[in-house]
Amino acid sequence: MFGMIKNSLFGGVENNEGKLVSKGEKDGVAFEEREYEGGKFVSTEVSGKPFDEASKEAVLRLLKYVGGSNQKYAGMGMTSPVVITSYPAENETLQPNVKVLLRIPSQYQADPPVPTDDTIHIEDRESVTFYSTQFGGYAKEADYVSHAAKLRSCLGPDISYHTDHYMCCGYDPPMKPYGRRNEVWFIKNN
């Protein structure tokens, strides 16, 4: 357990924020278009629970994996962002199911350790282009929903992106009280 905490939370974080393509601002809301490199990711899903509870459970599973709960007992260190795939509901909330992803650290991309938890999977993901907006604080469901609405308004009807889901991203460990970075990503349609 200590290894999980030490390696996942206190160790160096490999940041993967993507390559900036363009940026803009509308009605006081800044947004960017960025390309995010493909590669190997570790993922897990939680269903049947409210977004905040499901996200926390899924993130803890992945922290255990990168902290050494894998067949190599490798404490890999943390990457950011933590990417939570969320699914909008009809009533301005998110559906009670999430898929959480972490990019496997660079030094393990060629041969990632096999998870010991059968709810955790290694997957190859293609590069994507997305539209994003950033905000601070400890993000909860209501924050992501609010900022997704702002991003949707900024992009307007002429920009094409996936509407059945979006990504809720966090870049910081839980013990960082100030200067926190969260984002909402809309995946661009090709």
UniProtKB/Swiss-Prot annotation:
Subunit structure: Monomer.
Keyword Ribosomal protein: no
Record protein name field: Heme-binding protein 1
Gene Ontology terms, MF aspect: heme binding
Keywords: Cytoplasm
A Pfam short name: SOUL
Designated gene of the protein: hebp1
Similarity comment: family membership: Belongs to the HEBP family.
